[in-house]
């Protein structure tokens, strides 16, 4: 992206029939996303992409870091009624004029920016965390830890998009990408109204929910639009607040209990399922926040969003940092065979750490549930605001 670019020159050759199963997109991304892509290319690891209609996420994996970016797919702007954009690449000829190949028309644009919901690895983002977050992390570094059991370094940040069947991807980085995301997490470029790339029938349904065009935004509006409409990232963390987790500290003397051993491994290694309310338990925010019909109502919703979002960020950092440790231990014990001395040593270590964790962070469960509740509430409010803006677009 840096440096001067030479002007394209040469003979033009038109190739308006792209290869089968090939889509041509205009890519817009900030410096952090570009560097992450370049790093993945150098380390030969594959990014993970997930679509949610005309929105989605890109995750760049690696040991010790994991960077999450959001993206939207929108329609490319056209110059005039008959204007358009074509994808052209230049082939430098050793002899004779250069050749310009037109691969086809660009109808969609992929805009990438850093996602707010990325949970940075605690050791990499320690300088960026608040004092309250550091206190929540300190449980794993203090106390009566038995000697001979070194601390496990974090391997990878929990993936908020992966299902419980997916495995972490390998990779490495010379510069922690989590720090790039922390520096760029408020970046959100201007963009055209969103468009769907699904079937025509699906596109008609999604056209009604496109985001309004954004020219200039206040900081709070940037933060509002940076919160993805997705499931809570905390739902992918280890389910250490389950009933099985409550039994770890009580059953530590039952060394021969295979059921308890299996229960322990399952609780640590398997991410918790999505917690959706039952039909009779309708969340209060669904009753309180309904469709927006006026600008004053929109402003009131945005004020409520900002108030809850400040609390959400604090809880998210505290809970994410504390849960990361058990996510790592869960992945570690899953790789060991049950009944082996190594498995037993790690199991005892987990029991001891969990007992210390409960003493140093007694409010973890309440804060975790509160954080997940706020995430769903903020996503709901954001959706209503964007829907109202879309209805008033162009009026």
Swiss-Prot record:
Residues 129-177, 189-281 are annotated as: Disordered. Keywords: Nucleus, Phosphoprotein, Transcription, Transcription regulation. Component of the little elongation complex (LEC), at least composed of ELL (ELL, ELL2 or ELL3), ZC3H8, ICE1 and ICE2. Component of the super elongation complex (SEC), at least composed of EAF1, EAF2, CDK9, MLLT3/AF9, AFF (AFF1 or AFF4), the P-TEFb complex and ELL (ELL, ELL2 or ELL3). Interacts with AFF4. Belongs to the ELL/occludin family. PANTHER family: OCCLUDIN AND RNA POLYMERASE II ELONGATION FACTOR ELL, RNA POLYMERASE II ELONGATION FACTOR ELL3. GO terms for cellular component: cell junction; chromosome; cytosol; nuclear speck; nucleolus; nucleus; transcription elongation factor complex. SUPFAM superfamilies: occludin/ELL-like. It comes from the Eukaryota. It holds the Pfam family ELL. This is RNA polymerase II elongation factor ELL3. GO terms for biological process: intrinsic apoptotic signaling pathway in response to DNA damage by p53 class mediator; negative regulation of intrinsic apoptotic signaling pathway in response to DNA damage by p53 class mediator; negative regulation of signal transduction by p53 class mediator; neural precursor cell proliferation; positive regulation of DNA-templated transcription, elongation; positive regulation of neural precursor cell proliferation; positive regulation of neurogenesis; positive regulation of stem cell proliferation. GO terms for molecular function: cis-regulatory region sequence-specific DNA binding. Residues 243-260 have a biased composition (Acidic residues). The keyword Transcription applies. Actively expressed in embryonic stem cells (ES cells), while it is weakly expressed in differentiated cells. Residues 269-279 have a biased composition (Low complexity). The modification Phosphoserine is found at residue 242. It is found in: Nucleus.
């Amino acid at each position: 992206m840096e440096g001067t670019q030479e002007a394209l020159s040469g003979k033009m050759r038109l190739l308006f029939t792209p290869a089968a199963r090939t889509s041509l997109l205009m890519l817009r991304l900030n410096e952090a996303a570009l560097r992450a892509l370049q790093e993945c290319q150098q380390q030969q690891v594959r990014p993970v992409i997930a679509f949610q209609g005309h929105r989605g996420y890109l995750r760049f994996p690696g040991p010790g870091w994991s960077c999450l970016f959001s993206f939207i797919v929108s329609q490319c702007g056209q110059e005039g009624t008959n204007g358009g954009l074509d994808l052209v690449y230049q082939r430098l000829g050793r002899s004779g004029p250069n050749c310009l190949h037109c691969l086809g028309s660009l109808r969609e644009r992929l805009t990438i920016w850093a996602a707010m919901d990325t949970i940075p690895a605690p050791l990499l983002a320690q300088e960026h965390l608040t004092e309250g977050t550091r206190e929540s992390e300190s449980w794993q570094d203090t106390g009566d830890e038995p000697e001979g059991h070194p601390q496990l370094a974090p391997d990878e940040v929990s993936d908020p998009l992966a299902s419980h069947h997916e495995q972490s991807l390998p990779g490495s980085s010379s510069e922690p990408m989590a720090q790039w995301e922390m520096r760029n997490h408020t970046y959100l470029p201007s963009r055209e109204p969103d468009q769907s790339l699904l079937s025509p029938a699906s596109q008609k349904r999604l056209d009604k929910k496109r985001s309004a065009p954004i020219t200039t935004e206040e900081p709070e509006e940037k933060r509002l639009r940076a919160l993805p409409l997705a499931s809570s990232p905390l739902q992918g963390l280890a389910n250490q607040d389950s009933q099985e987790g409550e039994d770890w500290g009580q059953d530590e003397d039952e060394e021969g209990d295979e059921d308890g051993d299996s229960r322990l491994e399952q609780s640590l290694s398997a991410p918790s399922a999505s917690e959706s309310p039952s039909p009779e338990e309708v969340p209060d925010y669904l009753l309180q926040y309904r469709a927006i019909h006026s600008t004053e109502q929109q402003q009131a919703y945005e004020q409520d969003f900002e108030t809850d979002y400040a609390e959400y960020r604090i809880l998210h950092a505290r809970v994410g940092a504390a849960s990361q440790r058990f996510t790592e231990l869960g992945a570690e014990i899953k790789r060991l065979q049950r009944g082996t001395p190594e498995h037993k040593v790690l199991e005892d270590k987990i029991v001891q750490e969990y007992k210390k964790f409960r003493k140093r962070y007694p409010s973890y469960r309440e804060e975790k549930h509160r954080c997940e509740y706020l995430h769903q509430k903020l996503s709901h409010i954001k959706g209503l605001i964007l829907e109202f803006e879309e209805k008033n677009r162009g009026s």
